């Protein structure tokens, strides 16, 4: 086992709990990571032998306790909408390389390729079992919303449409945002 795996995951869990409490004080906040998916990393660490079953059980107990406290710590218990960007291994490796963080690079540590592949599997399982709120899946293999404005607009349309469906965005606000976004863009 790795003596730091459990401590690091508890640290991240605590940070995510603080972030979600703050975000849930107001409407329409976006977090790039959520407390709801945090257990993926601890479970992976446990399955790969970096953390013990006892640490996994302590972690789960702590997470469950935090989730039970969330309604009292924030005005809502769960997000209105969860956005899941689904990518395959090839896309993930491309984006990791492009991001350029040395400690994430497969060229520096070839074992990371297996780690990323396993992470994708764990996320797929998590997505299939997520029930805390509405879930919108974005095809990250098709949409490069960071670099392509047309893709970004299509993704925003999908997210904002889902926000209308769950009642966090009015249809008139959706139409106004969409109109503003496509202002000056020629339709083909």
Model-derived regions, located:
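NTP-dependent small-molecule kinase module
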Residues: 97-188
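Conserved nucleotide-sensing/catalytic segment adjacent to the nucleotide-binding pocket
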Residues: 1-31, 39, 45, 49-51
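A glycine- and Lys/Arg-enriched "phosphate-lid" helix/loop adjacent to the NTP-binding pocket
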Residues: 41-121
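Conserved nucleotide-binding/hydrolysis micro-motifs of P-loop NTPases
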Residues: 35-37, 87-92, 142-144
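Generic structural signal for well-ordered alpha-helical scaffold segments
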Residues: 17, 21, 64-68, 124-127, ...
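Conserved catalytic network of the ASCE P-loop NTPase/AAA+ motor domain
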Residues: 21-24, 72-77, 128
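Hydrophobic/aromatic beta-strand patches that form the interior of the parallel beta-sheet core
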Residues: 29-31, 81-83, 136-138
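Short coil/turn segments at beta-strand junctions that form active-site/ligand-binding loops
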Residues: 25-28, 77-79, 133-134
């Amino acid at each position: 086992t790795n003596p730091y795996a459990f401590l690091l995951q508890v640290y991240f869990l605590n940070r995510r709990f603080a972030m979600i409490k703050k975000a849930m004080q107001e409407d329409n906040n976006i977090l790039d990571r959520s407390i709801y998916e945090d257990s993926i990393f601890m479970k992976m660490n446990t399955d790969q032998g970096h953390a013990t079953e006892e640490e996994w059980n302590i972690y789960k107990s702590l997470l469950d306790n935090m989730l039970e406290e969330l309604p009292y710590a924030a005005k809502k218990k769960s997000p209105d909408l969860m956005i899941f960007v689904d990518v395959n291994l090839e896309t993930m490796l491309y984006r990791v390389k492009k991001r350029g963080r040395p400690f994430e690079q497969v060229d520096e540590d070839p074992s990371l390729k297996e780690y990323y592949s396993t992470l994708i599997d764990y996320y797929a399982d998590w997505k299939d079992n997520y029930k805390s709120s509405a879930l919108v899946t974005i095809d990250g293999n098709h949409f490069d919303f960071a670099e392509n404005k047309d893709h970004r607009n299509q993704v925003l349309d999908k997210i904002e449409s889902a926000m209308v469906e769950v009642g966090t965005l009015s249809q008139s606000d959706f139409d106004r945002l969409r109109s503003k976004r496509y202002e000056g863009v020629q339709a083909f």
